[in-house]
Amino acid sequence: MSDLIHDFIFQSARRNPAAEALVYGQRRLDYGTLAEAVSRVTQGLLALGLQRAERVAVYLEKNVENVAAMFGAASAGGVFVPVNPLLKPEQVGYILADCNVRVLVTSADRLRLLVPVLASCPDLRTVIVTGSADKLVPVDGLQVLAWDAAVADNGQPRAPHRVIDTDMAAILYTSGSTGKPKGVVLSHRNMVAGAASVASYLENTPSDRILAVLPLSFDYGLSQLTTAFLSGATAVLINHLFAGDILKAVVAEKITGLAAVPPLWIQVAQLAWPEDCTLRYLTNSGGAMQRPTLDALRRALPRAKPFLMYGLTEAFRSTYLPPAELDRRPDSMGKAIPNAEVMVLRPDGSECDPGEPGELVHRGALVSLGYWNDPAKTAERFKPFVSAQRGLTLTEMAVWSGDTVRKDEEGFLYFITRADEMIKTSGYRVSPSEVEEVVYAREMVGEAAAIGVNHPTLGQAIVVIAYPREGATLTDAALLAACKPHLPAYMVPQKIVIAAASLPRNPNGKIDRKLLSQQYENTFMEADQ
């Protein structure tokens, strides 16, 4: 197996160049053709003078050029920065400036929107524009090239910059649930180890066809490509608008593997799936899948094995629950993935007892290189792990997740809450997920989020925003009455809001708790005035 992420494609091309590697709409690339496309990008970037470890940002919807640009940048010895296509110009400008991007790959339409913010990106030198060359937009002070011109054969091949597995491969920006987004620096080693670990427990083979639904800027979304290319499988790209688009793609492309986040699974579970569906497995990450959704998925897709996973961008993937354990412990996030150790620690660094809440700490090959250009945040989350072996002088870095979990007597882990989402009300600390589990269990809602908002006497009050299940009629009074018997008094929501539309999402498809908190932050303060 390769030590470098781009070699996944080249090795699969050497093994079976005619095997289908990438599908996007009507475009179908075998591994030989994809390897050639990546090599052309590599040579194009080197011809532009890209130096070792310089950043190449890719701001595109999922398509062939997006994939070729990312892996081509890595192959050249650079670092790719996938930018979520849903981000607005100001957010994109922040990322380009923050990680000192040298080359930007985008479309003509997106470039037009970005022009006002590019002046604040002093390290940017070149923009490569996909699509028709006649749509090029000139930008003062920047070299603007058409894709075909940038990747054209320029004669004598240039040798890529030499990199090793501990060098940077990518910078992935978090969704910004707490303040400005942070750039998580992933090495080749991180990404290769992550792909190998996930592919091993999903048992991926060249016969798999994996649907890439999630943004490639999301570590979980990017993982669909890396596991596919490592395994010699086929990755099918989709820029979906509705859950029904996913069903159509699964059927048309005979998809065997599907990854999604909880809000999307809620919609997918409500679809009428054919009995002969080819799905072999489903994976969930980005938040806990509620029991009613899991049960509905298992009824709709009885032959597909659900893998419940937990991961943080800072360590790619951390845990998974084997499908065989679902009936015994459907609320568990499982145990550590292969080649990782996951611990539950007290603030003093000692191991928690079974049932005792503590912070999830991850060590091993998947732990990233920290946050780009942010030594304070890096020092806060990435700390030396002191080995129990007294003779070992040097320490390794582990990542402290900020997530509170517990383990049972058999070592299976259970998520409690994120430290920055904990609701502090009437002197109690309440996990939003505890309240949400009760709300979902009433089987009246399709989506729900519990948040803490400022309150003049309670410190924070619990507010639940709920969106009804399809075809259901729901009132705040009915939902409150249904939940009250199942909650201690301090956990009973002070307010329930019935949303008129699906709850807002952040760029990674998760329910946007930060936005909801902002929308309702003055609810009780205004009422008190």
Each model region followed by its residue ranges:
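Conserved AMP-binding/adenylate-forming core of the ANL superfamily
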Residues: 2-5, 10, 18-63, 67-71, ...
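Conserved AMP-binding/adenylation subdomain of ANL enzymes
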Residues: 192-209, 216-257, 271
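AMP-binding/adenylate-forming catalytic domain of the ANL superfamily
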Residues: 130, 488-510
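Conserved AMP-binding A3 loop
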Residues: 30-32, 162, 169-193
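Structural core segment of the AMP-binding/adenylate-forming
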Residues: 47-48, 75-149, 470-472
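AMP-binding/adenylate-forming catalytic core of the ANL superfamily
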Residues: 87, 104-106, 250, 258, ...
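Conserved pre-ATP/AMP-binding loop-to-beta segment of ANL
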Residues: 2, 17-18, 128, 144, ...
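Gly/Ser/Thr-rich phosphate-binding loop
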Residues: 230, 255-260, 269-329, 341, ...
